[in-house]
Structures are given as structure tokens and as C-alpha cells.
């Protein structure tokens, strides 16, 4: 579950980073 899809996609990681 991606908290912030922008950070999730932007970071290109598997884990959704809230703090980027």
C-alpha cells in the first residue's frame, strides 16, 4: 500500500517511502 504514490514512484523503490 503506497502512502504517497508520488514518492513511491519517484523513488522507484518497492517500499513506499513517506519521507521520500
UniProtKB/Swiss-Prot annotation:
Annotated Peptidase M12A domain residues: 1-20
UniProt GO MF annotations: metalloendopeptidase activity
Names of the cofactor(s): Zn(2+)
Sorted UniProt keywords: Collagen degradation, Hydrolase, Metalloprotease, Protease, Zinc
Enzyme class, broadest EC rank: hydrolase
Entry annotated with the keyword Hydrolase: yes
Membrane-spanning intervals of the chain: none
Superkingdom, natural source: Eukaryota
InterPro entries to which the protein is assigned, alphabetical: Peptidase_M12A
Cofactor-binding details, from the entry: Binds 1 zinc ion per subunit.
BP GO terms, sorted: collagen catabolic process; proteolysis
EC number: 3.4.24.7
Catalytic activity: Cleavage of the triple helix of collagen at about three-quarters of the length of the molecule from the N-terminus, at 775-Gly-|-Ile-776 in the alpha1(I) chain. Cleaves synthetic substrates and alpha-macroglobulins at bonds where P1' is a hydrophobic residue
Function of the protein: This enzyme is a metal protease capable of degrading the native triple helix of collagen.
Protein name from the UniProt record: Collagenolytic protease 23 kDa
Organism: Chionoecetes opilio (Atlantic snow crab)
Lineage: Eukaryota, Metazoa, Ecdysozoa, Arthropoda, Crustacea
Amino acid at each position: 500500500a503506497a502512502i504517497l504514490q508520488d514518492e513511491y514512484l519517484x523513488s522507484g523503490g518497492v517500499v513506499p517511502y513517506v519521507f521520500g
